[in-house]
A protein has these predicted regions:
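N-terminal leader/capping segments at the start of a protein or of a new domain
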Residues: 1-34
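Context-gated lysine
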Residues: 8-10, 37, 54, 80
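Phosphate-binding glycine-rich loops and adjacent basic patches that engage nucleotide phosphates
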Residues: 23, 44-49, 79, 84
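A short glycine-rich, His/Asp/Glu-containing loop-to-beta-strand
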Residues: 38-67
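A short beta-loop-beta micro-motif enriched in histidine and acidic residues
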Residues: 54-58, 69-82
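Glycine- and acidic-residue-biased ligand/ion/polar-headgroup-sensing regions
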Residues: 67, 78-96
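Short, intrinsically disordered, charge-balanced linker/junction segments flanking boundaries
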Residues: 100-103
Length: 103
């Protein structure tokens, strides 16, 4: 299944990752939790970024967050980014960038 996901994302890369299509694909994706366990490494006090695939077009990873963990405010510098919650809950807060100047 992981190879199928990577191949589908490579197809989307050829189309510059059309947002509605990629979003729909990820929402409808029936992931096998046993396959994800191979990529799911947890830490008690901070989140982990577990890389599955990386090439010049995209990165695919499993991010494991313990409860009540936060990440610093950050940007993706114009990149398209999707997150899918496989288990549990995730709260995301998007901010509007008012200035690119340092504080």
């Amino acid at each position: 299944m992981i190879n199928e996901i990577i191949n589908k994302l490579k197809e989307f890369a050829q189309q510059n990752f059309p947002v509605p299509e990629v979003s729909s694909y990820l929402l409808d994706l029936n992931l096998n939790e046993n396959e994800l366990k191979f990529y799911s490494f947890h830490e008690e006090n901070f989140y982990t970024r577990n890389l599955i695939h990386k090439d010049s077009d995209f990165e695919l990873m499993v991010i494991c967050w313990p409860p009540n963990t936060t990440a610093p405010i950050h940007g993706h510098e114009g990149e398209k980014c999707w997150a899918r919650v496989q288990e549990g809950q995730l709260e995301i807060c998007n901010y509007e960038e008012i200035s690119s100047e340092p504080l």
